[in-house]
From Swiss-Prot:
Keywords: Aminoacyl-tRNA synthetase, ATP-binding, Cytoplasm, Ligase, Nucleotide-binding, Protein biosynthesis. Homodimer. InterPro entries: Aa-tRNA-synt_II, aa-tRNA-synth_II, aa-tRNA-synth_II/BPL/LPL, Asp-tRNA-ligase_1, Asp-tRNA-ligase_1_N, Asp/Asn-tRNA-synth_IIb, AspRS_core, GAD-like_sf. Residues 204-207 are annotated as: Aspartate. Its EC number is 6.1.1.12. One of its GO terms (biological process) is aspartyl-tRNA aminoacylation. GO terms for cellular component: cytoplasm. NCBIfam families: aspS_bact, PRK00476.1. It catalyses: tRNA(Asp) + L-aspartate + ATP = L-aspartyl-tRNA(Asp) + AMP + diphosphate. Catalyzes the attachment of L-aspartate to tRNA(Asp) in a two-step reaction: L-aspartate is first activated by ATP to form Asp-AMP and then transferred to the acceptor end of tRNA(Asp). It comes from the Bacteria. It comes from Clostridium perfringens (strain SM101 / Type A). This is Aspartate--tRNA ligase.
């Protein structure tokens, strides 16, 4: 059993001790990083949230305290009182390396078993072990630093929004299921058997209702939930910086959020984000980069070759153009030295994005090398090379198909080439861009209907509203995404605030008037009572912290994350609950039939 504090007070953090404290009597508390005996002296590296301080136990302390110090193992939690003295052998690699604590008193507050993971930076341990013993993983200095950054970030956000007239307000966690997009997490109601709440995928409708309520400017740092397949940058529960503004247009929302981002990056990293942030339409982003979240830290734009090859002798190209598709290419500088096997691998890569193949042209010192060169005249080949802006030593890669396939395949190939050839030269760069004028709707050929590209509450562009009845796929949205280094950092839109227009939007999406009112009647009803024009935006806080902390895995920035299957190794959730609990909720579990042969 550990010793009690008995009124002992810590008066300095381990990592804060400096030369200015020399001669002072202090008490520090923390965890033992290392314990070693050198020449009759006992040295303990003591760690807390702020850093590590060397503690020395001299042989004049007496046998009892020395034996006690020798018995201490890594991760014991201890308290030491003594005097800060100048360190004989300075350690320039530690902020506290000029001083040490000459121990006078020692308390062992609690002991520790041998930890299953090392408490050190750059830990190389299985993710399952790290997540199972997350409380130990979080003791590591690099993990502690991430959550200091997270705290500084949320404080900077709150400070800025408070200074700009925003009210921090909470919205319900138990709400109504309005399935449109990702699956909801459902919560059964005991009071209403057979009925369910849903955990919110976002506070979207409630923040719009707060604008109808007259609060003018709202924000919230809020938990959201989506029951979807997970990737490296997704979790089933995640945090959004959610905000909404009344009496604004698109430029107003974008300008305020640019200033918010500028403030946060300056406060947290000391980095100056250049504003105004450049803008690019959705159409341009897709045409040039094959993505609505382009990484602009390197060039290599997609080039349209359709006009150049539409009458050539290569049937693959001419058929693609004749059938309404396109022929487009990328130019990899210095890529002519790539071997055939590597080029073939790129061909297999684009096939995973439904491309039928990858044509290529190498511009070697001795001339053009390409399996498709025989289908072109010298003049036609030169025209392709000229249009691509290629030179000797380069490699041209071409895809021909319907536009959606060509752009997707080349967009992904562009990123693959960037990874393979390290095309991003400045890894510390923060390259922001706004993507605007998104398509309002996306057509699903399998279901034979339109879906909202963002959500059903997005305002169409004024000049496109007339197409909702005749050509819905042509309608652009007053929507905007903020992209950073090829990742969507946040997104928002101006919202519909008119009952009739909102009903029309639901109609285009395939809702009957009855089903629209059943799901969203509370919003449509609110729009009858003088709603203001309003719009907003939501940032993914977890993703923002990933950028600020320099990590590529969202699990690193969440205290207790789930794995890729939404399972918690620490608590072993989800778990089976008692039959009595299920009975009280009116729920009966049904085993899935084993379909395996």
């Amino acid at each position: 059993m550990g010793e009690a504090l008995n009124g002992l007070k810590r008066n300095i953090m381990c990592g804060d001790a400096r030369e200015s404290h020399i001669g002072q009597k202090v008490t520090v508390m923390g965890w033992v990083q290392r314990n070693r005996n050198l020449g009759g002296l006992q040295f303990i590296d003591l760690r807390d949230r702020e850093g590590i301080l060397q503690v020395v136990f001299n042989d004049d302390l007496g046998e009892e305290i020395l034996e006690k110090a020798k018995s201490i193992r890594p991760e014991y939690c201890i308290a030491v009182t003594g005097e800060i003295v100048k360190r004989e052998s300075v350690n320039p690699n530690m902020p506290t390396g000029m001083v040490e604590l000459k121990a006078e008193e020692l308390k062992i507050l609690s002991e520790s078993d041998t930890p299953p993971i090392y408490i050190k930076e750059d830990l190389d341990a299985a993710e399952s072990i790290r997540l199972k013993y997350r409380y130990l993983d979080l003791r590591r200095p690099d993990m502690q630093n991430i959550f200091k950054i997270r705290h500084k970030t949320t404080k900077a956000i709150r400070d800025y929004l408070d200074q700009n007239g925003f009210l921090e307000m909470e919205t319900p966690i138990l709400t109504k299921s309005t399935p449109e997009g990702a699956r909801d997490y459902l919560v059964p109601s005991r009071n209403y058997p057979g009925m369910f709440y849903a955990l919110p995928q976002s506070p979207q409708l409630f923040k719009q209702l707060l604008m109808v309520s007259g609060f003018d400017r709202y924000f919230q740092i809020v938990k959201c939930f989506r029951d979807e397949d997970l990737r490296a940058n997704r979790q089933p529960e995640f945090t959004q910086v959610d905000l909404e503004m009344s009496f604004v247009e698109q430029d107003d929302v974008m300008a305020l959020n640019e200033c918010l981002i500028k403030h946060v990056f300056k406060e947290v990293l000391g980095v100056d984000v250049k504003t105004p942030i450049k803008r690019m339409t959705f159409k341009d982003a897709m045409e040039k980069y094959g993505s609505d979240k382009p990484d602009l830290r390197f060039g290599m734009e997609i080039t349209n070759l359709s006009d150049v090859v539409k009458e050539c002798g290569f049937k693959v190209f001419t058929d693609a153009v004749a059938n309404g598709g396109s022929v487009r290419g990328l130019c990899l500088e210095g890529g002519a030295s790539m071997g055939r096997k590597d080029i073939d691998r790129l061909g297999e890569f684009v096939k995973t994005f439904k491309a039928k193949g990858l044509a290529w042209i190498q511009l070697k010192e001795e001339g053009v090398k390409s399996p498709i060169a025989k289908f072109f005249s010298e003049e036609e080949l030169n025209k392709i090379i000229e249009t691509m802006g290629a030179k000797t030593g380069d490699l041209i890669l071409i895809v021909a198909d319907k536009n959606s396939v060509v752009l997707k395949a080349l967009g992904e190939l562009r990123l693959e080439l960037s990874r393979k050839f390290d095309l991003v030269k400045d890894k510390s760069e923060f390259n922001f861009t706004w993507i605007t004028e998104f398509d309002l709707l996306e057509y699903d050929e399998e279901e034979g209907r339109y879906f909202a590209a963002h959500h059903p509450f997005t305002m169409p562009m004024d000049e496109d509203i007339k197409y909702l009845d005749t050509d819905p796929g042509r309608v652009r949205a007053k929507a905007y995404d903020l992209v950073l280094n090829g990742e969507e950092l946040g997104g928002g839109s101006i919202r519909i605030h008119d009952t009739k227009l909102q009903e029309k939007m639901f109609e285009v999406l395939g809702f009957t008037q009855e089903s629209a009112w059943e799901r969203f009647g509370f919003l449509l009803e609110a729009f009858k009572f003088g709603p203001p024009p309003h719009g907003g935006l939501a940032f993914g806080l977890d993703r923002m912290i990933m950028f600020l902390a320099g990590t590529e895995n969202i699990k690193d920035v969440i205290t207790f994350p789930k794995n890729q299957n939404a399972f918690c190794y620490l608590t072993e959730a989800p778990n089976i609950v008692d039959e009595e609990q299920l009975k009280e909720l009116g729920i009966e579990t049904i085993k899935k039939e084993d379909t395996a042969e």
